[in-house]
Amino acid sequence: MKIRGLLYAVVLIMGASTSAAETLLQRGDYLGNGIVACGNCHTPQTPSGPAPGMEMAGQFLVEEKGLFKAFAPNITQDKKTGIGGWTDQQIITAIREGKSPDGTIIGPPMPIGLYRGLSDRDVRAIVAYLRQVKPVNNEMEKSTYQIPLPPAYGPPVTNVPDIPQTDKIAYGAYLAGPAGHCIECHTPFVKGRPDFANQLGAGGFPFHGPWGVSVSANITPMPMALPIMATLNWPRSYAPASDRTAPG
């Protein structure tokens, strides 16, 4: 029993050391190609999959009649049509605060309200990953909005700590919220914004693409998301600033 306990302790220590030894780029590669899935929006899609040689080069995303027509911008290292000329801090500000270097506010479906909760280390890791994406010259159309965009999504974001991976519920909420933004696509939109307050995770968001139209599924254990919302207090934790006064 003592030997078994010692081996278990060694495994735990090795696991912790491996996690601590993870480089910023390794973490960024995991986030960018995994849970954050930058390419899902920013890489052009064809009926057979991602367009070859166009990683992160931008594409048409979605049009919500009377609300907005959204294009995912080119986020490759191309200095003319991408973000190659942006500083690291400008990229971080765009991701977590929804503001481009020229002061333009980034609108939906970019999940700024959730990305505000990305930890400092994770957002730096995403930048490290984006820095090694090859430049692609691809000028994208600008998104247009018939709904008013806020002057800001809240105060500047600073000092967001990592969520301990040992806290399974908190880390799971972080992955489903700020990092993976599962709830962004799986929550119905009301007046151009996801209805986190009343329909968290209830599905119903349409996606238009070469395949036709698909609709996000209800990922709650009940028809509506209120039981989960009450447990995790999502609106106050991760919703856009304008939604944080919603009852929770």
Spans of features found by a protein language model:
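The canonical Cys-X-X-Cys-His
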Residues: G28, I35-Q45, I91, I126, ...
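Ligand-binding pocket scaffold of soluble enzyme catalytic domains
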Residues: T23-L25, D88, D122, Y129-V133, ...
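Electrostatic cytochrome c docking/interface patches
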Residues: S17-N33, S48, P150-G177
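Electron-transfer interface patches adjacent to heme c in soluble/periplasmic c-type cytochromes
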Residues: G58-I92, G113-V123, N198-R244
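Extended, well-folded interaction surfaces typified by the phenylalanyl-tRNA synthetase beta subunit core
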Residues: N137-L149
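Detector for the c-type heme attachment site
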Residues: C41-P47, R96, P111, R131-Q132, ...
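Positively charged n-region of N-terminal signal peptides that target proteins for export
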Residues: M1-G5
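Bacterial N-terminal signal peptides
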Residues: L7-A16
